[in-house]
């Protein structure tokens, strides 16, 4: 492989499942990348990514999730690697801007993969049961290189279920340290990455200014609560059919009950884990203010990259 990687030279595959806005987002992608291919409705994150890799005809493949709207400059990105870097094992992650809470990080990010690596990896539903790092995410086992410039917006609030599921998944995953659940014998916020702790707090409190933002907060609080304060098996977060059934079981019937549940969970998380939440959340004006002034932490530097443009 070349040490200089141009995204224009890589196949692009749009990966969708059941997102309410997937057709709208795909139509937008085709105005910017008319040659983009598509995988739709494959169960399991590992299996779905392998379907994308099998569709690719290039050594690397760029995979774009179904809730993304890309920035046009994505396709102009060129990444130059250092001499010692091995392009066969590294994944480039371009952060995404989440419209619910303004967070910019790897959730929903566009990723450029070595095609063979995707075919060979075993994660999520295909993970080795003894490997905690691969049960619910890719990032703890694979050589992820975090790119500095964000390249898409994540619109995961097109329905109550989509927003709740997005919040719930992050409420679970932001609790983990390289896939491992913290103990209750030490302060919760000292056991996980500080950036993830800040993101978790934002998921729980910011977003009432957008459609279905309350559902994302409810999901984040419930995901954290079930992971840390019950005996629930957190690896079930990788199974979308499970999450859809869970949503049907726990969804409040009206906004009054929804807000009551958000407040109840927040109080429990504050009292039992010391998380910076509680009854209440940022109102629409406060949420807009947060998104206007909050500075997302810089992504980690990496000596494998000389420059990227």
Show which residues each predicted segment covers:
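N-terminal anchoring/stem segment of glycosyltransferases
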Residues: 1-54
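A general structural motif
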Residues: 7-9, 58, 86-89
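Glycine/Thr-rich phosphate-binding loops of Rossmann-like dinucleotide-binding domains
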Residues: 22, 71-72
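Short alpha-helix within the catalytic core of nucleotide-sugar-dependent glycosyltransferases
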Residues: 50, 58, 72-84
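Generic structural signal for bulky hydrophobic/aromatic residues embedded
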Residues: 55-57, 121
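Short aromatic/hydrophobic "clamp" motif used to bind/position activated sugar donors
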Residues: 61
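The conserved acidic donor/metal-binding loop of glycosyltransferases
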Residues: 65-69
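Catalytic-site signature of metal-activated, phosphate-bearing donor transferases
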Residues: 79-309
């Amino acid at each position: 492989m070349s040490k200089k990687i141009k995204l224009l030279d890589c196949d692009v595959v749009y990966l969708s499942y059941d997102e309410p806005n997937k057709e709208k987002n795909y139509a937008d992608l085709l105005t910017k990348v008319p040659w983009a291919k598509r995988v739709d409705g494959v169960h399991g994150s590992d299996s779905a990514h392998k379907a994308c890799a099998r569709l690719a005809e290039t050594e690397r493949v760029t995979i774009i999730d179904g809730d993304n709207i890309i920035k046009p400059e994505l396709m102009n990105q060129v990444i130059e690697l250092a001499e010692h870097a091995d392009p066969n094992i590294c994944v480039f992650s371009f952060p995404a801007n989440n419209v619910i809470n303004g967070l910019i990080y790897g959730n929903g990010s566009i990723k450029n993969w070595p095609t063979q690596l995707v075919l060979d990896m075993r994660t999520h539903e295909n993970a080795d049961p003894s490997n905690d790092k691969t049960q619910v995410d890719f990032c703890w086992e694979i050589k992820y290189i975090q790119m500095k410039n964000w390249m898409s917006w994540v619109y995961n609030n097109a329905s109550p279920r989509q927003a709740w599921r997005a919040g719930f998944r992050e409420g679970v995953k932001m609790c983990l340290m390289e896939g491992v659940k913290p103990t209750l014998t030490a302060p919760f916020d000292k056991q996980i990455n500080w950036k993830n702790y800040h993101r978790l707090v934002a998921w729980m409190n910011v977003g009432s200014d957008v459609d279905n933002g309350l559902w994302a907060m409810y999901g984040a609080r419930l995901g954290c609560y079930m992971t840390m304060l019950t005996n629930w098996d957190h690896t079930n977060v990788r199974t979308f059919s499970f999450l859809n059934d869970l949503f049907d079981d726990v969804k409040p019937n009206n906004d009054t009950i929804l807000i009551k549940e958000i407040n109840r969970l927040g109080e429990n998380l504050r009292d039992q884990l010391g998380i910076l939440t509680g009854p209440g959340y940022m109102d629409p004006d406060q949420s807009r203010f947060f998104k206007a002034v909050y500075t997302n932490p810089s992504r980690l530097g990496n000596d494998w990259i000389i420059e990227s443009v």
